[in-house]
From Swiss-Prot:
Protein's name according to its UniProt entry: DNA polymerase catalytic subunit
Comp. bias (Gly residues): 697-708
Species of the source: Tupaiid herpesvirus (strain 2) (TuHV-2)
Keyword list, A-Z: DNA replication, DNA-binding, DNA-directed DNA polymerase, Host nucleus, Nucleotidyltransferase, Transferase, Viral DNA replication
GO biological process: DNA-templated DNA replication; viral DNA genome replication
EC class (word): transferase
Length: 1171
């Protein structure tokens, strides 16, 4: 079309733009607009379809006029001083050049809620307007902490805290020598010349090991330049100097030393308000204070915060999936949904900002309920979005996969394409950070991060729901549509990225359609945000661990435990050592710090299960918080571990990767009765009458106080500091005050008991568990729905953190690994499980014991077989107990009493065995794989079967579920399954397949018919695999999901990111292809298969059905069958399927009748081939 449909004052030269009037663009007038018109020129990129409907291509033009937007046919010049037309006017001027009324002098404490923090190093020559009373804190330089939050009356606030130093500890000969060495290091490392180091002697002992008194040569090294100090500490560590707590940031020091909640209410005793012209932040109120003036307040309530959910749409110039670095791949629309978080219901109802906003290139038809802002070019669109972001100033930003795509795309376009810095749109006018980056060069480090890309915006917390949903829900894929269906019960109106360009370029109505789609995504994310309430959960963890909210979001659980240990160690006048990275990776701590053989230790016990279909009550007992209770019961900790040499090691003893679970001989075998061989220990457990001494755990386990193994026994002897003398060591505790754990192979670890030194880990766990009980009690009494939600997230944070302690000590790449603690925990856990199993089998079937818990009517009559009790399975912290002849309802009623009897007989507090559930029928397949029906419920509990695996397609899951339902619901099928499991193959050849089993075979035949007849929709046949790393890093390239990615790339379609599940369908392949072609040759993208009607490979899918059913019904098949999948396939009635070219010559026939249904045994004629 030749008609211009959108007035672009830059691309349409003959037409003169109307200058904004005094009332347009907020406070700006014509003179201001003319002044900005002389701003630096910028590149305009706009799709031709925005000016000429339906046309493709881009228009590019260098423009010297000021960027602007159009809202309701009125132009607005985009500048730092713009008052956004649809937002409430700010309480303070947007520019520092305009003065605001002075804040009143502080006459009382200032109460505020803090949600985010930033740490900066400020030097004495800084241009920042700092009150003279705080100047000495930054001379020559010093750390300034910026605390962002809101006051009690809802005003945004920035608190500048002065006087917080960064520091670490180290052992050295004398202070002057250490001082001189640090300054020499600064010359070597070419560090910043402006800094001052302070060294003073302190009295502390190490948390790592029991046996030393406070060091006589320990010094605290403090510095106002945090970056310099961190490098100095690392250099000392690399040179072999014993250092402690290197890398702990000044913000962490502030939160721990002052007991400040990282997300919560605080109070300022003294403060000084900055005038408007001297403010560094864009907050309504900015104050300065000393570090000693900040106090924490115990209150979990939230003020009203602003949240923004957004989504972007892009247009590729070449028709492929958009790439931000390509000049022609432009951003065409951005949707924003503004809504409140926290506060009271009345405050949320009075939220003054409109909810839905759309930023679009070109003219757009009106969209009901959406404020539409139109822009002449991409640069102005980005400028408008970031200006809106700065004016709205949200405390929280959310979206779906915004870290890996949206933010990275926007920042790349702004900074690389247009060379336009966006840091000025943070909460700080200068010195803020607005960036997206991948730590460690893009590789994933398990246990440290929950998201690959980190997005840092000073004063704004970014909460991407994509990694949150991946961690919280099991789904075949994690597309927004799938997640919304799971959580919200509805799907979005989808618009493919191939259809999107045509709609956008078609005209105003098409852009409105794309806009509705774009806004819809942001709205769905907002609803997911409010449904998941992950922000409340993350805030509770941040308060508990005293770490920033962004660390909870982007870091793993290691940092949470580490900061808690730092706080508790400081309260006990202890320091936490810093180890070399080689030791953390599992390198043997040899004298040279070189690599050594990696050590392993025995993991949790998994009993060999009694495989089969158990049509009798099976009770499940498990230990409540097994590993935390072991730590508390036995006083295990870094600080209670008795080493051969109490001197602090230069690196930790060898800590391996997380151990595999250890198989045991079985519930009834010798290893089960006597515990794990070579893994006994001296224990305070009581040995009940009737239980063998070996099963009771460690009689004669070693000489008192003996058997300890130094770090030399696990890869290298720890070095003893030359400055430590025997006189500085604690005296050796008495033998009765030492708890010895023999972990096998001649290795033992010793720990002092609680009366000698209380375990730090135990103290933390006891405190948190008591706090969790108090919170749950408060929940029961709480009637306010919002407060109840906050309390629930708090108790969940306490639970998750408590359960993370074992992983913290046992993770070889962690921040403070410790083999003695981790190995001792698993050793004690294995013994507890073995002792529990032995006690149950020795006592539960005794008549006297049963009479204590059950009524005569619950047990068999005198003329019936006596009751039987047998442990059929055990896994880490739970045992499965099969009761024969006992009424199921009675077991449920007295289950807790049975568990309490075991606890009382075997264990000491806080160890507690609990009754979890009762299966009325259980199919035990193998280790970690079973299916059972729970008493009082129709629901089936499944573990490890294809029904709950993400890799299986929906069609296979449906067939397997139907088969399982038949086995557990249909009495005839259940009886046939039980009968078949009791037969041998030879017996079955003589008597035939049990009659009830044919119902199951008919279901398989129907599934085969559906596949070969093309009656299964493509969506039900989708398989998926995780893209765990970049495609180029795979050694095995012949994988189906990698083949799909290569096909997508060849067609220039959207490619998945690392961590995504890649979906694919197995197609029939070319007609002349191999019959047994590998899956990677047949894998294709599901959307491509559906769009082009590509036939699927029915035989391969039926093969998957048979294998999945075989794996699920593994215990049902006769004994002696080796190829069970082939055996099952031979049982299914045979059928020949005609191709399309033959179907018109065929006539329908009735369903075939299985030969064995007519009484014959011909069905088994081909079973010999399955042997």
């Amino acid at each position: 079309m030749s008609t211009v449909t959108f007035f672009n004052p830059y691309l349409c030269g003959p037409r003169k733009p109307r200058a904004p009037s005094a009332g347009e663009g907020g406070a700006e007038g014509a003179a201001a607009a003319r002044a900005r018109a002389a701003s630096a020129p910028f590149l305009q990129i706009v799709p031709r379809g925005c000016l000429y409907d339906g046309e493709r291509g881009l228009l590019k033009h260098n423009c010297a006029l000021a960027p602007r937007m159009f809202f309701r046919d009125r132009p607005y010049v985009l500048s730092k001083d713009l008052v956004w037309p649809t937002l409430p006017p700010p309480a303070v001027p947007a520019s520092t050049t305009e003065r605001a009324p002075r804040a009143p002098a502080p006459s009382a404490d200032l109460l505020f809620h803090m949600y985010d923090q930033a740490e900066t190093v400020v030097s004495a020559d800084s241009k920042e307007l700092i009150h003279p009373g705080y100047r000495h804190r930054i001379t020559p330089c010093g750390v300034v902490l910026r605390l962002f939050g809101r006051t009690a009356d809802g005003a945004s606030l920035c608190v500048n805290v002065f006087g917080q130093d960064a520091y670490f500890y180290c052992r050295y000969g004398d202070a002057q020598s250490l001082h001189d060495r640090l300054y020499r290091l600064s010359d070597t490392l070419e560090l910043a010349p402006v800094f001052h180091v302070r060294v003073r002697r302190v009295q502390r002992c190490s948390i790592y090991g029991y046996g030393t008194r406070p060091f006589a040569d320990l010094y605290l090294v403090a510095c106002g330049n945090w970056h310099v100090l961190k490098k100095m500490g690392q250099c000392l560590l690399d040179e072999g100097v014993e250092v402690f707590e290197v890398g702990v940031s000044p913000l962490t020091r502030f939160l721990l030393d002052k007991k400040i909640p990282s997300f919560g209410w605080c109070r300022l005793r003294r403060w000084h308000a900055r005038p408007a012209h001297g403010r560094l932040s864009t907050a309504e109120l900015e104050v300065d204070c000393e570090v000693a003036d900040v106090r924490g307040v115990d209150d979990v309530a939230w003020p009203l915060y602003r949240c923004l959910s957004f989504d972007i749409e892009c247009l590729s110039g070449g028709g492929a999936f958009p790439v931000a670095e390509n000049l022609d791949d432009v951003v065409i629309q951005i949707s924003c949904v503004c809504y409140p978080v926290g506060g009271t219901e009345e405050q949320r109802a009075a939220f003054p900002v409109a909810e839905r906003h759309l930023f679009t290139l070109g003219p757009c038809a009106p969209i009901p309920g959406v404020l539409v802002y139109e822009f002449p070019s991409e640069f102005e669109l980005l400028c408008g979005f970031f200006t809106f972001f700065g004016r709205y100033a949200p405390e929280f930003v959310t979206g779906y996969n915004i870290n890996n795509f949206d933010w990275r795309y926007l920042l790349t376009r702004a900074e690389r394409v247009y060379r336009w810095p966006v840091a000025e749109y943070t909460r700080l006018r200068f010195g803020g950070r607005f960036c997206a980056y991948v730590p460690g060069g893009g590789g994933r480090q398990p246990g440290f991060r929950t998201a690959q890309t980190k997005v840092l915006i000073t004063g704004t917390v970014v909460l991407d729901l994509y990694p949150v949903c991946m961690a919280k829900v099991s789904a075949p894929d994690y597309k927004l549509n799938t997640v919304c269906e799971l959580y919200l019960g509805r799907q979005k109106e989808d618009l493919s990225y191939k259809e999107l360009p045509r709609a956008f370029l078609s005209g105003d109505a098409g852009r409105a359609r794309v806009g509705r789609y774009c806004v819809q995504d942001a709205v769905l994310v907002k609803e997911l945000f409010e449904k998941l309430n992950y922000h409340y959960e993350a805030a509770a963890v941040a308060r508990l661990a005293r770490i920033s909210l962004r660390k909870v979001i982007f870091e793993g659980q290691q940092i949470r435990i580490y900061t808690c240990l730092l706080e508790e160690a400081a309260a006990r006048q202890m320091v936490v050592p810093t180890f070399r990275s080689g030791a953390q990776r599992g390198a043997a701590p040899g004298a040279g710090g070189g690599g050594g053989e990696e050590t392993t230790y025995q993991g949790a016990t998994v009993f060999e299960p009694t495989v089969g279909y158990h049509h009798a009550p099976v009770a499940v007992f498990d230990f409540a918080s097994l590993y935390p209770s072991i730590i508390m019961a036995h006083n295990l900790c870094y600080s209670t571990w008795l080493r051969d040499d109490p001197g602090t090691p230069a690196r930790p003893p060898e800590t391996p990767a997380r151990p595999p679970e250890t198989p045991a001989a079985g519930p009834s075998g010798a290893a089960h009765a006597g515990g794990v061989p070579g893994a006994t220990f001296r224990t305070p457990f009581r040995t009940p009458a009737g239980v063998p001494a070996a099963a009771a755990g460690g009689a004669g386990a070693g000489p008192p106080g003996g058997g300890a193994v130094s770090s030399a026994s696990v890869g290298g002897r720890a070095a003893v500091s030359p400055s430590e003398t025997p006189a500085e060591r604690e005296p050796e505790p008495a033998p009765e005050d030492v708890f010895v754990v023999h972990v096998g192979q001649g290795v033992s670890y010793r720990f002092v008991r609680e009366n000698v030194r209380a375990s730090i880990l135990s103290e933390l766990l006891r405190r948190w568990l008591a706090q969790r009980r108090a919170v749950r009690e408060a929940m029961r009494e709480c009637e306010d729905e919002t407060r109840r939600l906050l309390l629930d997230k708090e108790q969940l944070a306490l639970k998750v953190t408590c359960n993370a302690f074992y992983g913290f000590t046992g993770f070889s790449q962690g921040m403070l690994p410790c083999l003695p603690v981790a190995a001792s925990i698993t050793t004690i856990g294995r013994d507890m499980l073995s002792r529990t199993s032995a006690y149950i089998e020795a006592h539960f079937a005794e008549p006297a014991f049963l009479a204590r818990f059950f009524e005569p009517g619950d047990l068999p009559r005198a003329d019936e077989p006596p009751p039987t009790v047998r442990v059929i399975y055990g896994d880490t912290d739970s045992v499965f107990v099969r009761f024969g002849g006992v009424r199921a309802g009675a077991i449920v009623a007295r289950g807790e009493d049975l568990a309490a009897a075991v606890t009382e007989a075997l264990f000491t507090e806080p160890v507690k065995l609990e009754f979890e559930k009762l299966f009325v029928a259980l199919m035990m397949i193998c280790k970690k794989r079973y299916i059972g029906r729970v008493f009082g419920s129709d629901a089936l509990v499944m573990k490890g079967v294809d029904l709950v695996r993400k890799t299986a397609c929906r069609f296979v899951k449906t067939v397997v579920r139907d088969v399982v339902e038949l086995v557990f619901r249909d009495a005839a099928v259940a009886e046939a399954a039980t009968r078949m499991s009791e037969l041998t193959l030879e017996e079955m050849r003589r008597v035939g397949v049990p009659a009830g089993f044919h119902v199951l075979l008919q279901r398989l035949a129907r599934a085969r018919d559906d596949l070969f007849s093309g009656r299964v929709e493509t969506a039900a046949l989708v398989l998926s695999s995780v893209l765990s790393q970049d495609v180029s890093r795979y050694k095995q390239l012949n994988l189906p999901h990698l083949a799909v990615i290569r096909r997508l790339a060849a067609r220039s379609e959207e490619l998945p990111s690392v961590g995504d599940r890649v979906s694919y369908v197995l197609t029939a392949g070319p007609p002349d292809g191999r019959a047994n072609a590998p899956n990677y040759e047949l894998a294709e993208d599901p959307d491509y298969v559906a769009a082009h009607r590509v036939p699927i490979h029915a035989a391969k899918y039926f093969e998957q059905v048979v294998k999945a059913v075989t794996n699920t019904l593994y215990p049902v098949f006769p004994r002696g069958v080796v190829r069970r999948d082939r055996f099952l396939a031979d049982l299914v009635p045979k059928r020949v399927y005609l191709g399309d070219e033959f179907k018109r010559h065929a006539r329908p026939v009735e369903e075939e009748v299985c030969e064995s249904e007519r009484g014959g045994s011909g069905l088994l004629s081909s079973l010999d081939s399955s042997r």
